Every structure is written in C-alpha cells, then in structure tokens.
C-alpha cells in the first residue's frame, strides 16, 4: 500500500482533484480531474513464495477538451513509472479520458 500512497501523492502534486476508483455519488468535481485504481497484481513466485509483487494501475485523466498542458503535468508526475497512454473520447459525457497504464 505504501507504493499506492506514493502514487497518490505524486498525482496530487499536479494540483488536480484526485480520487481512488470513483467519486461518491454527487461529489465529483468539475473537469479536469484524475482517477486511479488497481487493475491486477503481478506476483513473481520463487520457491513457493512471493519473491516480488507489483500492481498494474490505471490512471485516468478526464478533461473537457484535449489538454496537452495537463497531460504533461500528469506525465511529469508519472516520471518514475513506465507508462503506456491511450486517448478515448467519451461522447455520452462529452469529455476526453487519457488513460495511463503503469506498474507500481
């Protein structure tokens, strides 16, 4: 959990609102904001014991328009983690979701 706490701190350093998984009903701030959550674990097992464990985490940046400056803020915060990036436009919400997949 310490790794997730560190990630949370790095995401908060962007100045954007940050939440784990989802905002409580009716409490979501206006755009932009960040959401992150654990997708799955990758334990490395040796001699019938977990030798090393990492977690795949999804970090989602939601913006009203394509926002290169905020993407750069997030990418700077994620500098210690290798990431892959995907962009999705959510037409029903009229917003962009920039997805960063990282391993912590």
Which positions does each model-derived feature cover?
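Short intrinsically disordered coil segments
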Residues: 49-54, 75-77
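Acidic-leaning, charged glycine-interspersed low-complexity segments
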Residues: 72-104
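Residues at secondary-structure transition points
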Residues: 46-47, 69
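Oligomerization/assembly interface segments of phage tail-like spikes and tubes
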Residues: 53-64, 95-104
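Short, solvent-exposed beta-strand/turn "edge" segments of beta-rich domains on protein surfaces
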Residues: 47-50, 91
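Small/polar-rich, solvent-exposed N-terminal microdomains that initiate assembly or binding
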Residues: 1-43, 49
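Short Gly/Pro-enriched loop/turn and capping motifs at secondary-structure junctions
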Residues: 41-42, 64-66
């Amino acid at each position: 959990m310490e790794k997730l706490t560190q990630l949370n701190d790095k995401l908060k350093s962007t100045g954007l609102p940050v939440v784990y998984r989802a905002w409580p009903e009716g409490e979501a701030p206006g755009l932009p904001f960040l959401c992150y959550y654990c997708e799955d674990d990758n334990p490395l097992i040796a001699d019938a014991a977990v030798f090393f464990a990492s977690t795949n985490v999804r970090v989602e940046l939601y913006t009203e328009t394509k926002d290169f400056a905020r993407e750069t803020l997030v990418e700077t915060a994620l500098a210690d983690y290798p990431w892959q990036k995907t962009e999705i436009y959510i037409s029903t919400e009229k917003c962009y979701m920039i997805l960063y997949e990282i391993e912590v």
